[in-house]
Regions:
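Conserved active-site tyrosine of GNAT-family acetyltransferases
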Residues: 118, 123
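Conserved beta-strand-loop-alpha-helix junction that forms the acyl-donor binding cleft
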Residues: 76, 105-114, 132-136
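A short, acidic/glycine-rich surface segment
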Residues: 56, 113-117
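Extreme N-terminal starter segment of soluble prokaryotic enzymes
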Residues: 1-2
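Flexible nucleotide-binding loop
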Residues: 81
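Conserved GNAT acetyl-CoA-binding A-motif
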Residues: 95-107
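Residues forming the Rossmann-fold NAD(P)(H) cofactor-binding site
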Residues: 85
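Acetyl-CoA-dependent GNAT
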Residues: 5-71, 75, 88-90, 94, ...
Length: 137
């Protein structure tokens, strides 16, 4: 497995991986928004390639105070090989190098396998309520 930073050329493969992994696409999960993330934090959008191609990806961000783990996904059929754990550890290392001291992530409440994965990697649940508001374009 080879971990590397994503480029704009990787966007089609990244979108295909997320689709194959069953991730839901939301309003902000469009190429133009992803390009902005990649321009801002190019070293935090990570891919793990193996002999079969793109296996795992994660979209990391850092707002200067908190790091965020977004859209960590492994291709079905390649799960259980440690790819996601390795990619998460590399993202955490890169966030720490930027001065990040706390990492956050959001999981859909009914996604127990993913909750368990993050708990096994040292994350804990907080009793916060997530709210959002879309602003006019």
């Amino acid at each position: 497995m080879h971990i590397r930073a994503a480029t704009m050329d990787d966007m089609p493969a990244l979108m295909e991986l997320w689709t194959a992994a069953g991730l839901k696409f939301r309003r902000g999960d469009v190429p133009v928004e992803l390009a902005a993330v990649l321009a801002r934090d190019p070293e935090l959008v990570l891919l793990a390639d193996n002999e079969r191609g793109l296996a795992t990806a994660v979209l990391g961000t850092f707002d200067g105070r908190r790091g965020w783990v977004n859209r960590l996904a492994t291709r079905p059929g390649q799960r259980g090989r440690g790819h996601a754990t390795a990619l998460l550890a590399e993202l955490e290392r890169r966030l720490a190098a930027k001065g990040c001291r706390k990492v956050n992530l959001l999981i859909e409440a009914d996604n127990k396998p993913v909750t368990s994965f993050y708990e096994q990697n040292g994350y804990s649940t907080d009793q916060l309520i997530f709210m959002e508001k879309w602003l006019p374009a």
